[in-house]
Every structure is written in structure tokens, then in C-alpha cells.
Amino acid sequence: MKKITTLLTAIIGMALMNQVSATHVTVEVPTAGQLSSLVQDVNCDSITISGNLDGNDFWFIREQMPNLVYLNTSKVTVPGNRFPESGLYSKKTLQKIILPDNLETIGNNAFAYCSNLKDVTFPKTLVTIEYHTFYQCDLSEVTLPDKLKDIGDGAFYECYNLKKVNFPEKLANIGNSAFRQCNLSEVAFPDSLKTIGSYAFYKCQQLQKVTFPEKLEVIDNYAFSECFRLLAATLKSKTAPTISDNTFNFTKVFYVPKGTAKAYKDASYWSNLVIIDGDTPKKITVTLTTAGT
């Protein structure tokens, strides 16, 4: 009996130690590159940092803080107001980050393969998200800040759980494969959008509703290919955007502004599609008479 009691006491003690190890740390870094000398508990699961950080500091966070779940960098300044390239690449423990308040760019691969990252707070100052920034993250909803103009190639590629994106009003470009194989069901683009890159929404197989904005100029190769639930779409532009013969493959019906159907049908590759003058009906029914058509 005494052995059992001793064993239970040891187990409870270990459990309490594990609970205690879940700690929050606050650190101020006056000079970039000094974070490693200021963090006293590298096993903490939560940290708030203020001051100045550089690539070496983010390497330390990535490689030397094995339990980190929450990271608040809202009061941090980084060189050039750019979150460093591959800064937290494959930091698989990370679940939430608050980005620096004055950040303008998130660098290539900054959070790629952060497979448990669910929550990102973006600053109002953000202008550019670069290549593969959030590749294969676990985001389910993203609200992008008002000043954002450019979403880079593969920025949210294979974020399989991403169901909703709130696009900002100044967005001009969505890069190649930016939202490829995401789980979006509906997309509402801002009027400012001009280009949608190749494969941008490729294999978004839950996508059912898309409205293309008035200033859109280009929808590139395979941008909406393999979106087999997207049977129809609406365009606000009176001038047909440039497309290719493989931009769409399941989407066959397009509703365009009244009086512009002929112009669309005369444009390259649009003549192969069904163009309908006027507003999108509340209910769309598409009948397939032959398999594969």
C-alpha cells in the first residue's frame, strides 16, 4: 500500500511540475540580437517581447524555445519593418502570434510549415505578404488589414482548413497559388483588385460563389480550375478580363453587367463560355445533358 501511495504522489508531483512549466515570460530587448541572453526560461509556452529583434533573435525563438505556443511581438521593431524571411519557419508548436504594430512586409516562408498556427493578428501597417508566408498553416479565418496591397505567390497555399478570408479594400494583386487548395466556400473581392495569378484558387473544391470586381484586368492560367462546385460566377467589369482557355474548367456560366455580353463574347476565350446579361439570379440551376459537359 505504501508503494502505491508513493507512486501516486510521484505522478501527482510530475503533473504539478508540468502545470507550473506552462509559464508566460515578458522580455524587453534594447539591442537587436540580444534576446538569447535575456530569456531566462526557454521552456516557457508564452512570451511577450518588446524592443528590437533581428533574424538571429527569431532563430533563437524558432530553435531554442521548444514549447512556445503564444508569441506577442506587437511592440517589437524589426529591420526595414519586414518580418525576416523564414523567421519562424516550421515552428510547429506555435499556435498564435501578434505581429509588430509597425510591420509593413512579412518575408518569404516566414511561417511556412507552422502546422499548428491558428491565429494571426496583423498590424494596420501591413502592405505586402510575400512568397509561401503561411504555407500549410492551420488557419481557419483570416482578416487582412486595410493597407494590404499584395498577396504573394503561395502565401496561403495548402491551408486546408482556411474557410474564410476578409479581403481589404486596397488589395491590388493575388499571386500565383496564393489560396491553392484552401477550403473557401465564398470569395468577395474588393473593387481595387487588378490581377489574380495562375493557380490562385486551384482545387478550392468547396468554392461555390465568386464575384469578380469592376477593375479586374487578369485572371491567369488555372486560377479557378478544378473548383468543381463553382458552376457560375458574376463579373462587375464592363470590359472582359484577360483569361486563358484553362482559367476555368467547371465554371461555365458567367453573369456580366447589362449590355456587355457581346463584348465578352468577342473577347479571347470568353466565347467558349455561357455569357448572360444582367444580375445573378438568387438560384442557379445547371443541367448537364452529357457526362463530362
Provide a role label for each language-model segment:
Residues 1-24:
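Bacterial Sec-dependent N-terminal signal peptides
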Residues 24-29, 45-53, 67-80, 92-105, ...:
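Structural signature of tandem-repeat unit edges
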Residues 32-40, 55-63, 82-87, 109, ...:
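Short, T/G/N/S-enriched strand-turn elements that build extracellular solenoid repeat scaffolds
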Residues 87, 107-112, 130-135, 152-157, ...:
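Consensus positions within tandem repeat domains that build extended binding/scaffold surfaces
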Residues 262-269:
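Short, surface-exposed terminal/edge motifs of secreted or surface/virion proteins that either
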